[in-house]
Amino acid sequence: MVTTYLLFIVAYLLGSIPFALVVGKIGYGIDIREHGSGNLGGTNTFRTLGKKAGFTVTIADILKGTLATSLPMVFGLDIHPLWFGLAAVLGHVYPIFAKFRGGKAVATSAGVLLCYSPVVFAILAVVFFTLLFTTRYVSLSSMVTAVVAVIASIVSGDKIFIIAMCLLASMVIYKHRANIGRIINKTEPKANFSKKQK
């Protein structure tokens, strides 16, 4: 039982590692919270620091979700791995290492799925990138993909999977509430795939 509680804390702490902040400060000498949207996530890193930093942060944020979700399997615990994944996402959104001001749950949630259901992860990746290249709205693509994740979980019939996806989707949409207003008002920035970035 003690091991279980400790691993939940570890999962939260893994999620709390603010890679956008670390990359910004160490690699570029800036606090990314003071630039762009101020969000500690991949999208703001792409827009503020460029492709190299953006990919680095996004991959790192995905992997911390994957690693946290794998903890019960690594340590042989008979507890559903998605609970540990949820702890990591909570840490990503409300990181103790960054004054509880984190990202929007997308990349780390993807990492949770990568560990728990690679097939669903692959399907959602196709959905996300299809929407992104069609609409050029990262936020809209993220929210719609989150809803599709809920649908996929319902189809699976896995009750804990359904609960976890509903919680994650709710968190993703809640963290994008300001984006929803900007999309409606047509002021939401679009991804610029032709822009040259370092």
UniProtKB/Swiss-Prot annotation:
Belongs to the PlsY family. It comes from Bacillus thuringiensis subsp. konkukian (strain 97-27). The keyword Iron does not apply. Its main location: membrane. GO terms for molecular function: acyl-phosphate glycerol-3-phosphate acyltransferase activity. The chain crosses the membrane at residues 4-24, 71-91, 113-133, 147-167. Its EC number is 2.3.1.275. Catalyzes the transfer of an acyl group from acyl-phosphate (acyl-PO(4)) to glycerol-3-phosphate (G3P) to form lysophosphatidic acid (LPA). This enzyme utilizes acyl-phosphate as fatty acyl donor, but not acyl-CoA or acyl-ACP. Disulfide bonds: none annotated. Probably interacts with PlsX. The gene is plsY2. It catalyses: an acyl phosphate + sn-glycerol 3-phosphate = a 1-acyl-sn-glycero-3-phosphate + phosphate. InterPro entries: G3P_acylTferase_PlsY. Pathway: Lipid metabolism; phospholipid metabolism. It is a multi-pass membrane protein. GO terms for biological process: phospholipid biosynthetic process. One of its GO terms (cellular component) is plasma membrane. Keywords: Cell membrane, Lipid biosynthesis, Lipid metabolism, Membrane, Phospholipid biosynthesis, Phospholipid metabolism, Transferase, Transmembrane, Transmembrane helix. It comes from the Bacteria. It is an enzyme of class 2 (transferase). This is Glycerol-3-phosphate acyltransferase 2. It is found in: Cell membrane.
